[in-house]
Amino acid sequence: METARGRVLSVASECVPLLKTGGLADVVGALPGALAAEGWEMRVLMPCYRPLKWRLEEMEEVFAEEDLFGGPGRVMAGEVAGRKMLLLDAPHLYDREGGPYAGPDGDWGDNAQRFAALSWIGARIAREGLGDGWRPDVVHAHDWQAGFTPAYMNYWGSGGASSVLTVHNIAFQGWAPASLLSALRLPPQEFHPAALEYYGGLSSLKAGLVSADHITTVSPTYACELMRPEFGMGLQGVIAQRAGQVTGILNGVDTDIWSPEVEERPYDAESLKAKAENRAVLSGAFKLSVPGPLAILVSRLTYQKGIDLIPEVLPDFIAAGGGLAVLGTGDAPLEAAMRELEVRFPGRVGVRIGYDEGLSHLMFAGGDAVLVPSRFEPCGLTQMYGLRYGAIPVVALTGGLADTIINANPAAMAAGCATGLTFHPTEPPAFAEALRRLIHLYADPAAWETVQRNAMRHPVGWETSAAAYAALYRELVA
């Protein structure tokens, strides 16, 4: 590892292996190690939720804050699984039953204060550093939960640190009523459309977008999409005004964890024999007998993910010999629709409602194809897992899906570079046609194996992404 050439404070609401509700945690957890290889030292600041309280016994207090939006707080430092972590211990904000963002009755009513506190501490560390003399050159805030961080740095001082805001999913914007402006320690004179005001209220994400020195999103295509009304979700104008400071950088995946070579029945691009063994085990787990391609769906079951399209396109796919194994949870009507397909097509469709990390690994190892029909997808990790395991991705042409999959059209097949199948628009006819192409490809074993091997050789690790972030940091601190 190179000697650290810079210091970065990552401010986020979740991070593996401490806590995960979605892909954000994977990214935040992967960046420190990936950036270390580029010579950057990253520390991660996140809230100390109730399930993490026990870790405080192994950590040291860095500093305290007497009045942290309604009560005292303290920052605790320690190392977790090789990551230098800073946990914000503020019991009045984080020590409660339920998830990090919501309780049994919905979103926590004080989420604005809870995550303003996280941002406030991030900005304080930028200004004052830590007790050991560590002070960041760059503060990297993630999504709405850390969106106020660049704003606080602007209004209360940054200590010379630069700020980056990464938009992982613009659908979540951190809205709060304007009446909280002063309580959130934001200057009233900045409550106007060019700054903090957002449709009569506040948005922590908008505050970050107008305040950060640079904005990143999690794929180049998503960076462009966010400037269009159908994807920007009300913030397209804000982002378009800052187009010169917006960069799309694809996420990567942890290739040590997500690797067919470390599974129970290992295989690689040079020897695919054990993939058939995994397929047999997967078929047994879901009680399936599928003569054609066995597709998998590992996803949140939501409209955004295009799950409502599955019942419309699946009958023809089944009739042509295909099958489907589903793992996911989400909207009740879509969960019910998946169960109905299982009843309608016994032995050809299997469904597990919920999430099981071990089962998901088996599904990628045994699946012939993975379906990702998202209406929008900022980056997407599922298709990258598919590439890694030779489960050929069938994806909608949007966001990170468009940036990671090379469509198996005649030109790409002739050039020997195809890695999957894409379709556009995200509607049943186009999706159904992509599945027909999948059936046709599967019927040609040589062509199928070529695409499989191409997919498995496609780089999906963090090396390229980390280099891009490191280049951005260097530019900001130059």
Curated annotation (Swiss-Prot):
GO terms for biological process: glycogen biosynthetic process. The gene is glgA. It catalyses: [(1->4)-alpha-D-glucosyl](n) + ADP-alpha-D-glucose = [(1->4)-alpha-D-glucosyl](n+1) + ADP + H(+). Coiled coil: none annotated. Gene3D superfamilies: Glycogen Phosphorylase B (3.40.50.2000). InterPro entries: GS/SS (IPR011835), Starch_synth_cat_dom (IPR013534). NCBIfam families: glgA, PRK00654.1-2. Belongs to the glycosyltransferase 1 family. Bacterial/plant glycogen synthase subfamily. This is Glycogen synthase. ADP-alpha-D-glucose binds at residue 20. Keywords: Glycogen biosynthesis, Glycosyltransferase, Transferase. Synthesizes alpha-1,4-glucan chains using ADP-glucose. Its EC number is 2.4.1.21. It comes from the Bacteria. It is an enzyme of class 2 (transferase). Pathway: Glycan biosynthesis; glycogen biosynthesis. GO terms for molecular function: alpha-1,4-glucan glucosyltransferase (ADP-glucose donor) activity; alpha-1,4-glucan glucosyltransferase (UDP-glucose donor) activity. SUPFAM superfamilies: UDP-Glycosyltransferase/glycogen phosphorylase (SSF53756). Pfam families: Glyco_trans_1_4, Glyco_transf_5. GO terms for cellular component: cytosol. CDD domains: GT5_Glycogen_synthase_DULL1-like (cd03791).
